[in-house]
């Protein structure tokens, strides 16, 4: 039996089409995925992301523990509320999960991890935390709502108290603050400005209804996927998993190689991959008719004249751009063009950086 978030009833009242998403009943859309997508790019939309897991870590050695657990380095986190994106890797350098870590005090950090990987994440974290005497609290008492779009912060702020408005005033991206009973973070998964707001479960339904009244459009998983793909953001299980290195998933920037004496899980394997060479994640654009879909083969001839083949990890029609885009994992050495096999047709595609839209504007 699939689980329900505290907002399940609100979704049905808003006319959502519900689907089972990794064991959670979640809204796919509320009538028009396209309208929801455009609302986030041009105004404000909101997503129930309460299926994600918030994990609080307490203990005097929490920073030391996270410097070992994560490929990125929490030594960078010195300002209260600052957030960091990182992979959590296994010994062979594969990605167990990608997550966000927040720093509050030396003995209090917070992780936000994916729903699909919840059980293995918690098991892995608990196993490795033991020598560091970390107190781990899974915050199943909290719901999480993402409000995203150019007008999202302004509309969300109409629900805040004076204290909360003051707390978020001038807050830069990738920060979070606890203000009253809300944890408000300037993070998201759409390429737009906005907030991700955690609150007690019993407050979530009222907060959702108030956002609807403030003119924020409910959005489902369908729009969430096209928005994150336009923004070039990875989806766990597609761009990366336990068998795929962050180096092959456009996550090289999340690996803190310095200081060289910091030991983190997967470091040795990554150093070997870096020396030997590895696959890369690229963007693909197809302006001709048709849609680039997951798992389609991508072919190109490298500089040595050898035929090479990769695979599309995520593909869709881009509502913002009006043509098809994709992320693809390919061997090193791809040029500016490639061929994608769609049924029995070979379609030419342009190879780009793996990001297509930022703040509502085309970058590909």
Curated annotation (Swiss-Prot):
<dbReference type="InterPro" id="IPR006222">
    <property type="entry name" value="GCV_T_N"/>
</dbReference>
<dbReference type="InterPro" id="IPR027266">
    <property type="entry name" value="TrmE/GcvT_dom1"/>
</dbReference>
<dbReference type="InterPro" id="IPR022903">
    <property type="entry name" value="GCS_T_bac"/>
</dbReference>
<dbReference type="GO" id="GO:0005960">
    <property type="term" value="C:glycine cleavage complex"/>
</dbReference>
<dbReference type="InterPro" id="IPR028896">
    <property type="entry name" value="GcvT/YgfZ/DmdA"/>
</dbReference>
<dbReference type="InterPro" id="IPR006223">
    <property type="entry name" value="GCS_T"/>
</dbReference>
<comment type="similarity">
    <text>Belongs to the GcvT family.</text>
</comment>
<keyword id="KW-0808">Transferase</keyword>
<comment type="subunit">
    <text>The glycine cleavage system is composed of four proteins: P, T, L and H.</text>
</comment>
<dbReference type="InterPro" id="IPR029043">
    <property type="entry name" value="GcvT/YgfZ_C"/>
</dbReference>
<comment type="function">
    <text>The glycine cleavage system catalyzes the degradation of glycine.</text>
</comment>
<protein>
    <recommendedName>
        <fullName>Aminomethyltransferase</fullName>
        <ecNumber>2.1.2.10</ecNumber>
    </recommendedName>
</protein>
<dbReference type="Pfam" id="PF08669">
    <property type="entry name" value="GCV_T_C"/>
</dbReference>
<dbReference type="GO" id="GO:0019464">
    <property type="term" value="P:glycine decarboxylation via glycine cleavage system"/>
</dbReference>
<dbReference type="GO" id="GO:0005829">
    <property type="term" value="C:cytosol"/>
</dbReference>
<keyword id="KW-0032">Aminotransferase</keyword>
<dbReference type="Pfam" id="PF01571">
    <property type="entry name" value="GCV_T"/>
</dbReference>
<dbReference type="GO" id="GO:0004047">
    <property type="term" value="F:aminomethyltransferase activity"/>
</dbReference>
<dbReference type="InterPro" id="IPR013977">
    <property type="entry name" value="GCST_C"/>
</dbReference>
<dbReference type="GO" id="GO:0008483">
    <property type="term" value="F:transaminase activity"/>
</dbReference>
